[in-house]
């Protein structure tokens, strides 16, 4: 890791040194009294790169005779007769659009639901709600339960509740806690809606949630490892020296 940091430092020092020298070189032409024309309307030996825009006689910015900025006769900025800045009859731009329904407002319930995944759920003692998952394909060892699961999988949760992985000593502890809280919350919510779960439902739901909790643990463990690796990389002395040097070049 240290050798890699030193090589990165040497590479960026060489690159930014060349960039710093380039910044100090004067730019030819284009300035005041430097011989170049910075404005398209002025003649130059090479011709005009930006020819003047417009339409027919007396048309500034295109349009018919006497039309500023295009549009019909007597229309400033385009639109129908008597329409300033376009719009329907008697409409001043986008204001006072008579007779048009207002735009639908975004439901705050939808916004809250979209931001729920990965956030701490209030009232559950620090548990977070995971992202939605596809329900796993599980074989339960007999045709009846396999068929029952296929026909009723929509009744089972597709998200799990969990705490951060650093609060557990191993995967089994995480999964056990995750299954218990998820099954409990889903059962209470479903019962409140007037539905009931049978013993078969509970058995199948525990298996399904267990697989989802294992997946959640793997995702959280990988994310925690990547965060730790990033902190370790940026805390190494060569990288700190490199960042300090880059800041010096940018500011200077």
UniProtKB/Swiss-Prot annotation:
Pfam families for this protein: Prion, Prion_bPrPp, Prion_octapep
UniProt entry tagged with the keyword Membrane: yes
Subcellular location: Cell membrane; Golgi apparatus
The entry's keywords: Amyloid, Cell membrane, Copper, Disulfide bond, Glycoprotein, Golgi apparatus, GPI-anchor, Lipoprotein, Membrane, Metal-binding, Prion, Repeat, Signal, Zinc
Binding site for Cu(2+) 1: 61-63
Annotated Cu(2+) 3 binding sites: 77-79
Composition skew (Gly residues), residue ranges: 53-93
GO biological process terms on file: cellular response to amyloid-beta; cellular response to copper ion; cellular response to xenobiotic stimulus; intracellular signal transduction; learning or memory; negative regulation of activated T cell proliferation; negative regulation of amyloid-beta formation; negative regulation of apoptotic process
Binding site for Cu(2+) 4: 85-87
Positions of GPI-anchor amidated alanine lipidation: 229
Stretch list, region Interaction with GRB2, ERI3 and SYN1: 23-229
Propeptide segment residues: 230-252
Residue numbers spanned by region 5 X 8 AA tandem repeats of P-H-G-G-G-W-G-Q: 51-92
GO molecular function, one term: glycosaminoglycan binding
Binding-site residues for Cu(2+) 2, renumbered to this chain: 69-71
Similarity comment: Belongs to the prion family.
Role summary: Its primary physiological function is unclear. Has cytoprotective activity against internal or environmental stresses. May play a role in neuronal development and synaptic plasticity. May be required for neuronal myelin sheath maintenance. May play a role in iron uptake and iron homeostasis. Soluble oligomers are toxic to cultured neuroblastoma cells and induce apoptosis (in vitro). Association with GPC1 (via its heparan sulfate chains) targets PRNP to lipid rafts. Also provides Cu(2+) or Zn(2+) for the ascorbate-mediated GPC1 deaminase degradation of its heparan sulfate side chains.
Subunit architecture: Monomer and homodimer. Has a tendency to aggregate into amyloid fibrils containing a cross-beta spine, formed by a steric zipper of superposed beta-strands. Soluble oligomers may represent an intermediate stage on the path to fibril formation. Copper binding may promote oligomerization. Interacts with GRB2, APP, ERI3/PRNPIP and SYN1. Mislocalized cytosolically exposed PrP interacts with MGRN1; this interaction alters MGRN1 subcellular location and causes lysosomal enlargement. Interacts with KIAA1191.
Annotated disorder: Found in high quantity in the brain of humans and animals infected with degenerative neurological diseases such as kuru, Creutzfeldt-Jakob disease (CJD), Gerstmann-Straussler syndrome (GSS), scrapie, bovine spongiform encephalopathy (BSE), transmissible mink encephalopathy (TME), etc.
Name of the molecule in the record: Major prion protein
Gene name of this polypeptide: PRNP
